[in-house]
Amino acid sequence: MIIGFIGIGKLGSPASDFFEEAGHVVKRADVGDSIEDCVKDCEFVFVAVPTPHDPLYDGKYICSDLEPKDFSYDIVKDVITKANKVMNKEQCLVLISTVLPGTMRREIAHLANNTNLLYNPYLIAMGTVKADMANPEMIMIGGDSEWAAALQIMYMNMPVNCNRYIKGTYEEIESTKIFYNTFITMKITMCNMIQDVAMKLGNMNVDVVTQALAESTDRIMSPKYMKAGMGDGGSCHPRDNIALRWLAEELDLGYDLFGSIIHAREQQASNMAKYLKELSKEHDLPIVIMGKSFKPDLEYEDGSPSILVSQFCECTFDDVTKPAVFLLAHSRQTTFGKANKEYDLPEGSIAVDPWRERKDAIGYGV
């Protein structure tokens, strides 16, 4: 099958490669490329352009006290409008970018009146996009049932290990995607609350509690994301929670659960910074955070919990030239199941491991 991909960035690049490696002919268009050339002869055209949030609202800066804001859909609307002009009813646009519930019908669907439109967001993580696409927990497709069925058949003929296809309205799929992401942040924030309790109470190892809960699969579900440590990060989860504050206000729900979660995430970063400052004062050492990106071995800083901690204390990043209080913010073991990076820290330094995995470090949460 010939398919098109508009938007060849952090998501579109590995996603389009995955389709190509699965045997499809993939035509790509990025900024400045011809959309008409990209969509010609394609049955499905995937749109993977950004839906950016205000730069202050991605999760690495303090924002729980700011007014809620929706994502910006200008880029998506521009691409859909241009593609619609050169497509027909024998083709289908497939948006995979994250949007808030209600967006497809309110902002986008009417722009695709010459063709067909589906919403098909992915449950992927930066650094493991191809692996996540090959082994998705579920594949979600919103929109016209006949085109949704055709897209499902395409996936079923690819090397995709998935037994669960969720098809529904735009609103159902928008909500499944966004609440899946924010449910993860809620789990992490709850685990880090237990970590804060351990630090305050004493005589308590956070891992004893979280492991007991993680193994309680009868009612509490999966053990994933049940390791206390740094806050949730990345280009999806924090900003999705932040944006849902806007939706709660827009729909006049009468409460702001996600504002509370984001406030808790920020306060947990503040608590960690306070602990680092106490060590810094006690030992007369500066504070250095090892790992500025939101995840080990990646350069992306979107929603970085390390940068969020730095908002609450005076510190530098990744400087091992002199003794310091070092926060070892990254855990390859927790994130990827790989061996942790070894640091050769200057003599006289203090290492703080919020993941409690290194024998030569102070375990935060014990």
Task: Annotate the PLM regions.
Residues 1-366:
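Structural/interface elements that position substrates and couple domains in central-metabolism enzymes
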